[in-house]
Regions:
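Conserved short beta-strand edge segments in small beta-sheet-based binding/regulatory domains
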Residues: 298-304, 398-400
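Flexible, low-complexity linker/tail segments at the boundary of structured domains
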Residues: 363-364
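Short Ser/Thr-interspersed hydrophobic loop/turn segments at strand-loop and sheet-helix junctions
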Residues: 454-455
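M16 family metallopeptidases and their MPP-like homologs
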Residues: 1-105, 120-127, 198, 205-294, ...
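Alpha-helical scaffold elements lining the catalytic groove of polysaccharide deacetylases
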Residues: 347-351, 355
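Enzymes that process phosphate groups on RNA ends and nucleotide/triphosphate substrates
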Residues: 448
Length: 526
């Protein structure tokens, strides 16, 4: 890859560390580079890397009729600047299929010996400037580099398991009803455990199926005094992996497959999201089952998470954007107990066992979950797997909804302004408007039109005419729970000397849009 400039190609290694862990981080990445140079990669490591590369090429080939224009632009630019050939994905995929299986791991290991050298080395070290904080000196770093060849190292042991994702015998459910919707072209399935599934075939992409499962409840059902655990629920619950697999082991088990699943617990809902290649649909279903039923506890992974979080929070106050975000939250929600600002001193109060309990509570009843499967779907092929895995999800027929904790954006017109010392002075301005709006397809569509029209207006008036900013971000959002509400945010950054003039233009153009609506030219482009 290029290093700082296109005239300098380099093999580079990067690490982020705690403030007091710079020496350890540097030594660790140098040890791994030297280990790879001295002993090479293992056969199993290489097989996984090759399988993942082949899968990515296969996916690109399958999507060859749906390639985005931007991808072609990138290829043309690379061809013009670097003389990179453009044979097309059909030829590239055929070539990779022929060549990749015949490239041995020894060839890659020989390349590592050429890439990791004892000369022409550059080290960049960047960190916060703080009184009392010491970093390694140039001489200390140079001494560490000289020690590389004498590091006491052993070959890497790649622990690989052939264990299936699900080792237990799953007794699946049944599809108890099936109904086609001719208006939307979808099919509704109801399973024996109460799970509802909507399947909608689309041809936007040839090698993709998207999944979303939703249930009402979320973190709103937990008391306010658990806000520290609530704030870290999504980060901590699955930090140890799922089933019998740590996160690292799971990535090994999924080598060569294109399937991923994640869980998310918001204020009023708990969700399961996933995507896969059609050929890996069963793998996505298996991951969904494990994500629902089997969060894996790993105390070591949890401690690592806490250490990373502490390092992140240590210097967050020095970041002007952190201060800006905190100020916005305070301005919108005041002293509401759920509008917490997590501090480093709070991290040790995170209760891992309690978070696992909270997670399991949210996913112990699938009977009120509705799943949506969209993409290159084959309903008849998928139905047995839907019944087996989604039909096996736990069900206790719990009838619940979210709890309204009254965390509303305050009413009225307010202006908050604060200053923070910066090396390069810059003003960040946010306008936020909120109000009641019916949550339906029409409102969401109109809001999308408004976002796009405002983007065009502000690009013309503020970026091009005034030259005052690189861009203005307009983002409207409709929410249904806990109440139907519309929030419109308009954000931009500029020279502090220009902020008042540009802010006036933002308001002027927004009021004009409210009175006149988008122009015919804008609607044509939308």
């Amino acid at each position: 890859e290029y290093f700082l400039a296109k005239t300098k190609e380099a093999f580079s290694l990067t690490a982020n560390s705690k403030i007091d862990g710079v020496d350890l981080a540097m030594k660790t990445i140098l040890e791994e580079a030297e280990r790879a140079r001295r002993f090479g990669f293992t056969e199993t490591e290489y097989e996984r890397a090759r399988a993942n590369y082949m899968q990515a090429m296969e996916s690109a080939y399958n999507e060859r009729e749906k390639t985005k224009s931007g991808n072609y632009v990138d290829e043309y630019v690379n061809n013009f600047l670097d003389k990179e050939p453009i044979p097309g994905i059909e030829f590239e995929y055929m070539l990779v299929q022929q060549m990749a299986p015949n490239i041995p791991v020894t060839a890659v290991n020989e390349l590592m010996k050429q890439l990791v050298t004892d000369n022409n080395q550059v080290v960049l070290l960047a960190g916060p400037q703080k009184e009392g904080l010491k970093y390694p000196t140039k001489e200390e770093i140079a001494a560490l580099l000289k020690q590389m060849s004498s590091f006491d190292l052993k070959p890497y042991e790649d622990k690989v398991s052939n264990e299936p994702l699900i080792s237990e015998d799953i007794k699946g459910g049944k599809i108890v009803s099936e109904k086609a919707d001719d208006v939307y072209g979808s099919t509704k399935l109801v399973l024996s455990n109460g799970v509802t599934v909507y399947v909608k075939p689309t041809d936007f992409k040839a090698d993709q199926i998207m999944m979303k499962g939703v249930s009402l409840g979320g973190t709103s059902v937990f008391p306010n005094d658990e806000i520290i655990n609530i704030s870290q629920l999504n980060g901590v619950a699955l930090v140890g992996g799922i089933g019998n697999f740590s996160k690292v082991d799971l990535s090994k088990a999924l080598a060569g497959k294109r399937a991923s699943v994640g869980a998310g617990i918001g204020n009023t809902t708990e969700t399961i999201s996933g995507s896969c290649s059609p050929k890996d649909f069963e793998t996505m279903m298996q991951l969904t089952y494990l994500t629902f039923t089997s969060p894996r506890k790993d105390n070591e992974a949890f401690e690592s998470y806490k250490n990373r979080l502490k390092a992140q929070l240590q210097n967050s106050d020095a970041n002007p954007m952190t201060a800006f975000s905190d100020t916005v939250t305070r301005a919108l929600y005041g002293d509401h107990p759920r509008a917490i600002k997590l501090k480093e001193s709070m991290v040790d109060q995170i209760d891992y066992d309690r978070i696992l309990e909270m997670y399991k509570d949210r996913y112990k009843d699938a009977s009120d979950f509705t799943f949506y499967l969209v993409g290159n779907v084959n309903l008849e092929q998928m139905k047995p797997m839907i019944a087996k895995y989604l039909g096996a999800l736990p069900s206790i027929n719990r009838k619940e909804t979210f709890k309204d904790n009254k965390m509303y954006i305050r009413k009225g017109e307010y202006k908050n302004e604060f200053a923070k010392k910066q090396e390069t002075p810059m003003a960040t301005i946010m306008f936020l408007y909120s109000g009641t709006c019916k949550y339906d397809l029409r409102s969401n569509t109109l809001l999308s039109f408004l976002d796009q029209a405002l983007d065009m207006v502000y690009t013309a008036e503020i970026r091009e005419k005034e030259g005052g900013t690189y861009g203005v971000s307009c983002n409207g959002n409709l929410s249904k729970y806990p109440k139907e509400e519309l929030v419109l945010q308009i954000v931009f950054q500029t020279d502090p000397a220009k902020k008042d003039k540009l802010s006036a233009i933002v308001v002027e153009q927004l009021e004009k849009m409210a009175k006149e609506g988008p122009s015919a030219e804008h609607m044509q482009k939308i």
